[in-house]
Amino acid sequence: MLLIRIYRMLTDHFKNFFLYYLILTLALVSGIVIGPLLIKIFNLESKIRILRLANPYFSLALTSSYLENSVLRASIVQQIYLVLVICLMGFLNVGFYILPLVLLAKGITLGFTVGFLVSNMGLKGLVLSIGGIYPQNLFILAGLIGLGAVVMSTKEVVRKPLSRVFINYHKGRSNDAIVLGILYTIILLVGAILEGVLSPRILGLSLDYFIKL
C-alpha cells in the first residue's frame, strides 16, 4: 500500500533525523516569540509597512490593487518561492545553517502579524488571528519544517564517505527524500489554498481599523 509506505517513510525520517526537526521547530518558535516584541520598537506607520510584507492578505488589502482571488495567487506564489529557496539550500554548503534562519524569519513574520492584531484590536484581533491566520499556518509551518528537515538530512548523507554500499544507500535515501519533499510541498500548497480562502473572509473584518486611521 502506497499510503502505508509513505507513512513509514515519514516516521522513519522523523526518528532518524529528529534533531533536525527539533532545530527547525525551535527556530520557528523563537521567531514567533520575537515577532510580537518588535511591535514595541516601531511606530504605527512602520508597523503597517512590516505587516504588508509579513502577510499576503494585508499586502494586497492595504493597497488599491486588492482583488479577492489575488490573495490565493499571492499565497501560492509565496509558498512556491519558499520551497525553491529551501531546495536551493540543499546545493549550498552554507544551506545547512541558513535553513533554521529561514524558519526563524517565517516565525517572526507570523508572530508580528498576530501581535499587531492583538495589540491594536484586543480580543477581536485574537479571534481574527485564530480564525484567519492559525488554520492555514498549521499546514504551512508543518510543510516548511518537514521540507527543511528533508533537505538537511540529504546534505548529511552527501557528506558520508563514498563506497558501493553508500551509493546504494544514498539512492534509497534520495528516493525517499524526493517523495517526502513532494508530500511536504503538497502540505504547503494546502496551507496556501486555505490562506487564500480564509484570509479575505476573516481578516477582512479587520479592515475597519485601518480605515479609521
What residue ranges belong to the model's regions?
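N-terminal signal-anchor transmembrane alpha helix
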Residues: 12-46
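Interfacial helix-start motif at the membrane-water boundary
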Residues: 59-89
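Transmembrane alpha-helix/helix-exit interface in multi-pass inner-membrane proteins
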Residues: 37-40, 44, 90-116
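Hydrophobic alpha-helical transmembrane segments of integral membrane proteins
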Residues: 102-135, 179-194
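Terminal transmembrane helical module of multi-pass membrane proteins
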Residues: 146-213
